Design a protein with these regions (language model features):
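Canonical Radical SAM [4Fe-4S] cluster-binding loop centered on the CxxxCxxC motif
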Residues: 61, 65-101
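Short acidic donor-binding/metal-coordinating loop in glycosyltransferase active sites
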Residues: 70, 124-125
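N-terminal [4Fe-4S]-dependent radical SAM core
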Residues: 2-67
């Protein structure tokens, strides 16, 4: 995937989504809508940007992370989610699911190109809605990589239930749980399909996993807190310092994109 951007000074750049690198473009280089690495053609690209032999080497030999989208379904309907039906140009929460055979093929290809420790990230939608697939793909991946692979996913926490604890702990998953800072704000933004609040259920799930294995909870569960406005900071700070499930936790902060 390529993305063309222009700076405030009028300089043009090309972002290569495959390699996560940025190139400076000459003024006469044009990219048509929907262009890809294949449609642009490597010789054509090399006329306008720095030759990417180093990029090709990275793609072929230095794979480190594989992201697997398990499902487009989600059990929440966050008011700012770009996959909501209100955003007509984005995908919706469709019933599209992963092809397991294709996923295993891609994992094997990834294994052949990963020269060092590897990372598998399960993505959604809400990945825990496809927990059987997580189990199958995790076991398959471990049969290839042995001890060289680590697993992670981001979840809203609604389906982080007791029946999953043993498997997640045994396979040393790194789990990021997304919250909206504090209860009142969270429940106004992160609602269920039926329009109900979600904070109390998520806190209950976190409390259960902390009681089940406090070491895993402390070391392997990270909180991502969405900040919707600067005014939220005081309330978020209070929640972090008074909620026993959040005190001392690693918390990352993010801001939703505003139109």
């Amino acid at each position: 995937m390529y993305l063309e951007v222009e700076s405030n000074k009028g300089n043009r750049y090309l972002f290569d989504g495959l390699s996560n690198e940025i190139y400076s473009l000459k003024p006469d280089f044009k990219i048509t809508a929907g262009a890809s690495r294949n449609s642009l053609g490597l010789p054509n690209i090399e006329r306008f940007v720095t030759p990417d032999s180093q990029t090709e080497s990275k793609l072929n030999n230095l794979a480190k992370t594989l992201i697997i989208e398990l499902t487009e379904q989600c059990n929440l309907r966050c008011t700012y989610c770009v996959f909501d039906d209100a955003y007509s140009k984005e995908r919706s929460h469709s019933s599209t699911k992963l092809n397991i055979s294709l996923a295993k093929e891609k994992i094997y290809n990834f294994f052949c190109r990963a020269k060092e420790d590897a990372y598998i990230i399960f993505y959604g939608g809400e990945p825990l809605l496809e927990f059987k697939e997580i189990i199958e793909l995790t076991n398959y991946t471990k049969s290839l990589f042995s001890e060289r692979v680590k697993f992670s996913f981001t979840t809203n926490g609604m389906a982080l239930t007791e029946d999953k604890f043993d498997f997640l702990i045994e396979n040393d998953f790194l789990i990021t749980v997304s919250l909206d800072g504090f209860k009142k704000n969270h429940d106004s933004k992160r609602i269920t399909i039926n329009g109900n609040p979600s904070w109390d259920r998520i806190m209950s799930n976190l409390e259960k996993i902390k009681s089940y294995n406090s070491y895993f909870y402390d070391s392997k569960i990270i909180i991502n807190s969405v900040i919707n406005s600067i005014e939220d900071l005081e309330n978020i700070n209070y929640e972090i310092n008074h909620n026993l499930l959040l005190i001392g936790k690693e918390i990352r902060f993010s801001f939703p994109i505003q139109d």
